[in-house]
UniProtKB/Swiss-Prot annotation:
Annotated InterPro entries: aa-tRNA-synth_II/BPL/LPL, Gly-tRNA-synth_heterodimer, Gly-tRNA_ligase_asu
Organism lineage string: Bacteria, Bacillati, Bacillota, Bacilli, Bacillales
Name assigned to this protein: Glycine--tRNA ligase alpha subunit
Catalyzed reactions: tRNA(Gly) + glycine + ATP = glycyl-tRNA(Gly) + AMP + diphosphate
PANTHER family registered for this protein in UniProt: GLYCINE--TRNA LIGASE, CHLOROPLASTIC_MITOCHONDRIAL 2, GLYCYL-TRNA SYNTHETASE
Gene name of the encoded protein: glyQ
One GO location term (cellular component): cytosol
GO terms of biological process kind: glycyl-tRNA aminoacylation
């Protein structure tokens, strides 16, 4: 099964479970969790079901396209369900069956791996899912997002698309993976992998990036003061990505690193608080929609 068919299969499976199929969010981010479809929608009491593919940029993992398992940008298939259903593990195993992986014929283990994202003030209880000894999915029950306690708890399922495809296609080099008929990962992404690695490690302007971080930080605060959650959060994401570029370049010392992470976290917490307050002013409208849909 090629990657395109994998994505279509997962989309169909989770759509059948009531998930909204969203498109990837158009601001750079290091993980699918950072999308507003997860970060913001996990806050507050309103129900939410979503599934989407998220390109995830990790500048420090760039290897000029020369490493068979490390990528500047990889892809995640992200599922969020709030509140978490009691049968979520079985729904997940059903998704593996849809991909042609029979749990009865493979060693599938849920290995405890509690998760946190310090820069966003997020934490949860969770597991890595191992398929015949290889991690393919992260399974997390959110306890806190943006410093706000999650009530009710959301469950997040994050499939590593290239990792899972490597298993399904039995390929050792990620660039040899078939994306769709006639196109490999190498065909689609090798040039970008090389160029982003050159930029990250060689040609990026450190002074400019420091300036951008401060500019984005100020604009995030200014838009929160205006009560504009989504524009503010876009600038939080830009701060995070800019920090990752500086960190990958080695421009931030160990002692400075903690301070920069704290600055991003403070912004994320303010956005989370503002989002909750704005939804509360609206009377948490999706609660009413959920109630009416069951009448």
């Amino acid at each position: 099964m090629n990657i395109q068919d994998m994505i279509l299969t997962l989309q169909k499976h989770w759509s059948n479970e009531g998930c909204v199929l969203m498109q990837s969010y158009d601001v750079e981010k290091g993980a699918g969790t950072m999308s507003p479809y997860t970060f913001l929608r996990s806050i507050g009491p309103e129900p939410w079901r979503v599934a989407y593919v998220e390109p995830s940029r990790r500048p420090a993992d760039g290897r000029y396209g020369e490493n068979p398992n490390r990528l500047y940008q990889h892809h995640q298939f992200q599922v969020i369900i709030k509140p978490s259903p009691d049968n979520i593990q079985e729904l997940y195993l059903d998704s593996l069956r849809a991909l042609g992986i029979d749990p009865l014929e493979h060693d599938i283990r849920f290995v405890e791996d509690n998760w946190e994202n310090p820069s966003l003030g997020c934490a949860g209880l969770g597991w890595e899912v191992w398929l015949d000894g290889m991690e393919i999915t992260q399974f997390t029950y959110f306890q806190q997002v943006g410093g706000i306690e999650c009530k009710p708890v959301s469950v997040e399922i994050t499939y590593g698309i290239e990792r899972l495809a490597s298993y399904i296609q039995d390929k050792e080099n990620v660039f040899d993976l078939e994306w769709t008929s006639g196109f490999t990962v190498k065909d689609l992404f090798m040039m970008a992998e090389y160029e982003h690695s050159v930029y990250t490690f060689e040609t990026s302007d450190v002074d400019m990036l420091f300036h951008l971080f401060s500019t984005y930080e100020k604009e995030a605060i200014r838009q929160m003061d205006n009560g504009l959650v989504h524009p503010a959060y876009d600038y939080v994401l830009k701060c995070s990505h800019t920090f990752n570029l500086l960190d990958a370049k080695g421009a931030i010392s160990v002692t400075e690193r903690t301070g920069y992470i704290g600055r991003v976290r403070n912004l994320a917490r303010k956005v989370a608080k503002t989002y909750y307050e704005e939804r509360e002013k609206l009377g948490f409208p999706m609660l009413k929609e959920e109630g009416s849909s069951h009448e």
